[in-house]
UniProtKB/Swiss-Prot annotation:
This is tRNA (guanine(9)-N1)-methyltransferase. InterPro entries: MT_TRM10-typ, MT_TRM10-typ_sf, TRM10/TRM10A, tRNA_m1G_MeTrfase_euk, tRNA_MeTrfase_TRMD/TRM10. Residues 1-16 have a biased composition (Polar residues). It catalyses: guanosine(9) in tRNA + S-adenosyl-L-methionine = N(1)-methylguanosine(9) in tRNA + S-adenosyl-L-homocysteine + H(+). The keyword Transport does not apply. The keyword Methyltransferase applies. Residues 25-34 have a biased composition (Basic and acidic residues). It comes from Candida albicans (strain SC5314 / ATCC MYA-2876) (Yeast). GO terms for cellular component: cytoplasm; nucleus. The active site is at residue 249. Residues 204-215 have a biased composition (Low complexity).
């Protein structure tokens, strides 16, 4: 019996595979000084400031090393999967470690609540802000995959630099699964019924889950979320679509989304941030946080405070009881 017990508790102690680190020698003070002198002598092309040229060189270096970086990241992920398989292969199916890794439910909200990300602000953003917005949309997709309640997303005004960014750097968005779609039509065109090219899903096909070129949206069921209003939402209404402004501008453009909503006859409202958390400055959240908060509201049975604390980084919030 003793021998059998010892055999049953054998654990694979073989060392985990690792990626050899590339050792780079630190430059000497003389080399650093030489580099500094070369930078001072460097000729900045016409039309560039020194700062802009430095940024351009950095972008070129990234393009030169991008493939190597991606290969290292893929290898890290492969090794992580391998380590996970080794940890789990000798464990029983009822082991606590397996129980601690549930697969998220594929349930979609039955209340017909959906989300539009209005990206019709391309000309108001700098290049870095376009990159940031594209990453936030990617974060929305990640939240959709992992949340229990997956609110459908439609990205409107998917064109210009934003689309170019996706096609160049995030081209696998065509393979995204779930109820997320992209259209070059603007929110204004949907509301007014102005014709444009047909909405496409991530496979480039006509998307039956979104309005086509002749459809309009009933503004009675639209709510534009903006911090520039005193009207707060207390719950997410069934059969309503909540619009998130797809813009990264460091608050340069005040009341931008508010004014657009008023022009289109769309109701405006803000999330009840002040009732549950305290934030420094204006109560403005990034696009991906707003989307995830809406999903978490359903997941936590309408508990805004729990949703805020689950989504926002602890360093940015301070719990506050409802008044």
């Amino acid at each position: 019996m003793t021998e059998q017990t010892s055999e049953a508790t054998v654990v694979n102690n073989s060392p985990a595979p690792t990626i050899p680190k590339i050792k780079r020698e630190k430059p000497t003070p003389e080399e650093i000084e030489e580099r500094r002198k070369l930078k001072q002598l460097e000729v900045v092309p016409e039309g560039f400031s020194r700062k802009q040229w430095k940024r351009e060189l950095k972008k070129q270096r990234w393009q030169d090393t991008k493939q190597e970086y991606l290969e290292v990241q893929r290898e890290k992920k492969r090794l992580a999967r391998q380590r996970k398989r080794e940890r789990l292969k000798d464990l029983d199916e009822n082991d606590e470690l397996r129980k601690a890794q549930p697969i998220p439910s594929r349930q979609i909200s039955t209340n017909n609540v959906s989300v539009i990300i209005d990206c019709d602000f391309d000309e108001l953003m700098h290049e870095k802000e376009i990159v940031s917005l594209s990453n936030q949309i990617k974060a929305c997709y990640s939240a959709m995959r992992h949340c229990t309640y997956k609110l459908p997303i439609q990205i409107t005004s998917f064109n210009k630099r934003l689309k170019q960014r996706f096609e160049a750097q995030l081209h696998d968005y065509h393979l995204w699964q779930g109820n997320i779609s992209f259209t070059d039509r603007s929110l204004t065109e949907y509301v007014t019924g102005a014709p444009n090219s047909e909405s496409k899903d991530n496979d480039g096909n006509s998307n039956s889950n979104t309005t086509n070129s002749t459809d309009t949206i009933n503004t009675e069921n639209l709510v534009y979320l903006t911090a520039d209003t005193d009207e707060e939402i207390t719950k997410l209404e069934p059969n309503h679509t909540y619009i998130i402004g797809g813009i990264v501008d460091k608050n340069r453009h005040k009341q931008l989304c508010y004014n657009k909503a008023k022009e289109l006859g769309i109701k405006v409202a803000r999330l009840p941030i002040g009732k549950y958390i305290e934030m420094n400055g204006r109560h403005v959240l990034v696009t991906s946080h707003v989307y995830e908060l809406l999903c978490k509201w359903f997941e936590n049975d309408g508990d805004w405070e729990t949703a805020f604390n689950k989504v926002l980084p602890p360093r940015k919030i301070k719990s506050k009881s409802p008044s």
